[in-house]
Amino acid sequence: MSRVGKLPITIPEGVKIGLNDLEVKISGPKGELSKTFKGNIAISLVENKLLVKPLAANKNARAMWGTARSIISNMVTGVKEGFKLKLEINGVGYRAMVKGKYLNLMLAKSHNTKIEIPSDIKIEMPKQNIIILEGTDKEKLGQFASIIIKQRPPEPYKGKGIKFENQFIPRKEGKKN
């Protein structure tokens, strides 16, 4: 039995839920999200609480049970409060800036890297080396953050690169002569 899946999802004030078979539409003060689930699960709304249950006892249905519950819970949190990710850019001459709908990264390459910003993600830059990403969809936010980090992942010798705010980078010793 799934420990995550059996927990009900409480619907906060100001959040509306629309159920259509395995399609869930959630709208709130921060926006609207929808997702269609596949698999052997049933989603029901009972007294301002969402319940997810497996329709079969096989391994796939049990796996989807907890996953679907977590995704729906993140959707509810996203439309109510939103999600924030903070990225740090470390390195001499490494910086970023927003130009229109593009994030321009200067990361000691022969060219600047331009990344198109998805329409549902907002970027704030208090400094040139700090990027704050905000959005309602936790999955898309993490995906976009990983695309940014992939441009220059942190290296273990000097710690240069792009990383999450409190991410620990294990350091290595340099060459000894």
UniProtKB/Swiss-Prot annotation:
Spans through the membrane: none
InterPro entries in the cross-refs: Ribosomal_uL6-like (IPR000702), Ribosomal_uL6-like_a/b-dom_sf (IPR036789), Ribosomal_uL6_a/b-dom (IPR020040), Ribosomal_uL6_bac-type (IPR019906), Ribosomal_uL6_CS (IPR002358)
One Gene Ontology term, aspect cellular component: ribosome
Alphabetical keyword list: Ribonucleoprotein, Ribosomal protein, RNA-binding, rRNA-binding
UniProt xrefs under SUPFAM superfamilies: Ribosomal protein L6 (SSF56053)
Keyword rRNA-binding: yes
Highest taxon in the source lineage: Bacteria
GO molecular function: rRNA binding; structural constituent of ribosome
UniProt cross-references to PROSITE patterns, sorted A to Z: RIBOSOMAL_L6_1
Any Gene Ontology biological process: cytoplasmic translation
HAMAP family for the chain: Ribosomal_uL6_B
Function description: This protein binds to the 23S rRNA, and is important in its secondary structure. It is located near the subunit interface in the base of the L7/L12 stalk, and near the tRNA binding site of the peptidyltransferase center.
Family: Belongs to the universal ribosomal protein uL6 family.
Assembly and binders: Part of the 50S ribosomal subunit.
Protein name, per record: Large ribosomal subunit protein uL6
UniProt gene name: rplF
